[in-house]
Amino acid sequence: MSDSASNTEDSIQIEIFPSRILSPETAQKLMGEIYKVDGVIRVMVQGNRLPDRVSAGPGTGEKVEHPLRKPIQIGDQVIELKICVGRIRVELSNAEAKEQIREVCEKLLPFPFEFREGHFLRKKPTVTDYAKLGPEADPRLLGMVDPKAKTDQLIFIEKQKEQEEDKDKDE
């Protein structure tokens, strides 16, 4: 078994860093289009946590109705946003996917953004990965665990193999 988080050692990692925090609607459109690109291995969305309850002051314990805390749909799964979408990190299997994602960003983001290539996602397990996921963790989840999050808050969306098989039958 390989220590790599992906099947290819020469994967490409990119970071999309918009100059503004994305609204839930824009985040849904962008993530939906990224989800459709062939060659995407894994995606991590990063940003400030949106509080669920008031933690201090006179309203301690009251529920917070934040306008950015809305459910979004990616593929067939509905997810409640618990963060402000600030940056998106993507691991890709080829350079063609990189250009497709750049085109998607240019089409959907009406404001400037940085599009960088580098090493953003870990490929070897950290202490947090070991504590949260165990010794036999899925390599695609390595480096993607928030140390403060509970294990039930981790969201993993896998492309449906049935959809890919249907595409092969149609061709």
From Swiss-Prot:
Presence of the UniProt keyword Ubl conjugation in the record: no
What Pfam families does its record include? Answer: MCR_D (PF02505)
Q: Which GO terms describe its biological process?
A: methanogenesis
Keyword GTP-binding listed? The answer is no
Top-rank taxon: Archaea
Which keywords fit this entry according to its UniProt record? Answer: Methanogenesis
Quaternary structure, per UniProt, is: MCR is composed of three subunits: alpha, beta, and gamma. The function of proteins C and D is not known.
Record's protein name: Methyl-coenzyme M reductase operon protein D
Which organism is the protein's source? Answer: Methanosarcina barkeri (strain Fusaro / DSM 804)
Q: What is the lineage of its organism?
A: Archaea, Methanobacteriati, Methanobacteriota, Stenosarchaea group, Methanomicrobia
